Structure formats: structure tokens, C-alpha cells
Amino acid sequence: MSKVSGAGEEKLKVLALHGYRQNADSFKSKLGSFRKMLNKYVEFVFVSAPHPAAPLEAVGGEPDPNQRSWWFNKDDRTFKGTNQGGPAYGFDESLRLVERTWQAEGCHGLLGFSQGACFVGLLCDLSARGMTTMKPQFAVVASGFRSGSLVHLNYYENKVQIPSLHIFGETDEIITKDMSEALAETFLDPEVVTHPGGHYFPAQASLKETYVDFFRDQLQQHLEAKELQNATEENSFHLEGQEEAEESALQPVHEGLQNGSDSDSD
């Protein structure tokens, strides 16, 4: 059985999806302490959403290329987590980008914050229904919520059956506690971690053990599954070789019988 050990061993690759009006670089920076906690077990892959978001100061003004959005759920091409019954402009383009990145990087799991966490929930559901090439082994969801876009309302009919860690603040006023709890309930056996703060990704020392335990468990499961797959493929290879050898051994006998039959006919 494979065991998680020290530096130099295989790590998990986790695709990290930022929140609304963030980008890959800003999210990577915000997760600095979190990444440091998990450096032994995880390599994070960051990608920016394809759509420029309207600047916070002047909605309707010129988009800031550094502020990005995975999709827009309002007709003015902005996004708000509490919006219900709206569109999902740009979602398909973001889905294709994330699928390409996942494939190119060889990722194992997903992590998301806020809008990115909402996206993670949708991706996990799509994967469970075989509607994406992505097959995440686990998910980490911070300040997540269910999408209220009309095209996403049927995404939550069946519970997602992969390990998941859900993190949210007791006093979050942007994505409230009940919104994050509603997303957690769409997973079969969610692990829930709360903190007393608001809308941010917590990385205080008191949570280190929880984070390390979760990712160490996922790495252990990944290594064991990989070991089992390798053993199965090796066994299949040996069986095929044995069958070919047996067929080769029988071939001269068949030829001899055929030759004997020809002689008798003469």
C-alpha cells in the first residue's frame, strides 16, 4: 500500500477557481498562507476567468481587465450571488476553458471561492452526470452557494458523491451561511468547517490540522487508487501474454493434425 511521505513524493494537483472580480494572480496571492500549509501535499493550478468584469466603482463603466468573471447572471452583464432566475452569460466559454486547463495540467481536484466555489459545485454535478470530460476526485468549496441562473436550476437534483470540504464564515454578509449550507447539502457526505469571520478564505493556524488532514486523506486515496490501477493493468498484461503463449504452444499440434489428415486423404 502506498503511503504519503515527505518531500519529493507525488502531490495532488488542484485547479483553483477565483471569485467574482478576482483573477488567477490575486487569488494565488490571497491563498499564500493556505498554500504554504499544504505545500507538502498539493500543487495548485490557477486560471483566470475569460470575461472582464465591470469595475466595482462604476457598474456600466469600462471593464477592468484585471477583474474577471466566470459568467454573468444579470442582464447588465454583472454578477450577484443572491440573484435568482437570471441568465448565465458566458458560462459555456468558461466551462471550455476550465476543461482545457484541467486536461492540460492533469488535475485531480477542484477548489473554489465564492463565484468560483459556485462553479465548482456545478462542475461536480456535470461530472457526476457524465456531461464534462473532467473527473474531480474531491472538491474544496469556500463561501460557496447554489447558482440561481435558470439554466442551472436542474443541476442539483442528485447528490454529488465525492469527498468535499465546505468552508464559510458565520458572519458573511455577501454569501450568507444558509447559502453555503444549501450548497453543502448537494454533496452526499460534506465536511463542513465554519469560522467566525466574513467573506474570505480563512487560513488561520487553528484550521491547519483540518486542511492538512483533508488533503492528506485525498492524496492517500489517490495513491492507493493509482497503485490498484497499475496492478490491474500489469495483471491484465501478464494474462494476455500467457494466453498468447498457450496459443503458440498449441499451434504446432494443430498443424500436425492437419498434416496427418492430408496424408490420410492421399
Curated annotation (Swiss-Prot):
Gene3D superfamilies, alphabetized: alpha/beta hydrolase (3.40.50.1820)
TM annotation in the entry: none
GO molecular function, one term: hydrolase activity
Domain of life: Eukaryota
Keyword Transmembrane helix part of the UniProt annotation: no
Keywords: Hydrolase
Family of the protein in this entry: Belongs to the LovG family.
Name assigned to this protein: Esterase AGAP003155
Organism: Anopheles gambiae (African malaria mosquito)
